[in-house]
Amino acid sequence: MNSEISTLVPDPKTFKEKKKEQEQYFFTDKVLEQIIKSFQYFENIVCICAPTLADAFWRFLKKDVYCIDIDDRFNYLPKFIHCNITKDEIKFPNDFKPDLIIVDPPFFGLNLKDLLNFVNKVSKNDNKIKLAIGYLIREEKNLLITFKDYNLQMTKFNMEYRTVDQTKWKNYGMYTNFECGKFKFE
């Protein structure tokens, strides 16, 4: 699958020219593969600020997941919703309720309270919903305090980003409120 992901996910060179204000960090092929394999059995997935992950679900599992992002380069995805999570309202079909929300937010330009408010809107204030957030380990305390009602914990999952030097990957962690596949608690 790795070779397929390399050829189908948008070319990382393109994203070297990313818009800096969007603080885009895209997962490596290995991470994309591990995430979609771990979460493939969830039915109603929402990816917030994780467009290459939504792309991988769609291309490799033929799974239409909601992709909420500001980057219109991903508007080819069937359930892409252009949204600035600090300003825009989000609308889903009335009967839609996610069973998994995956978030890989900008680490510096986004207030965690704004992110929490948005996640609450998407989850319809259900803090029992399965939630996975990639975040800076040095900001763990702030993340866990802000999302305390979701009972997040750090997992052993190794985060890797294409546009981040490998020596810095240890600075990122995946926090969830459940264990599944490669996502196990420490």
State what each model feature region is.
Residues 1-63, 68-96, 163-181, 185-186:
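S-adenosyl-L-methionine
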Residues 37-43, 59-60, 93-97, 123-127:
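Flexible, charged surface loops at secondary-structure boundaries
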Residues 43-45, 64-65, 99-101, 127-134:
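Hydrophobic beta-strand segments of well-ordered beta-sheets in folded domains
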Residues 45-49, 97-112:
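Conserved proline-anchored active-site loop of SAM-dependent methyltransferases
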Residues 48-54, 109, 138-140:
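Gly/Ser/Thr-rich loops at beta-strand to alpha-helix junctions
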Residues 62-64, 77, 128, 151:
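A generic structural signal for alpha->beta connector loops
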Residues 112-181:
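C-terminal substrate-binding/active-site "lid" region of AdoMet-derived donor-dependent transferases
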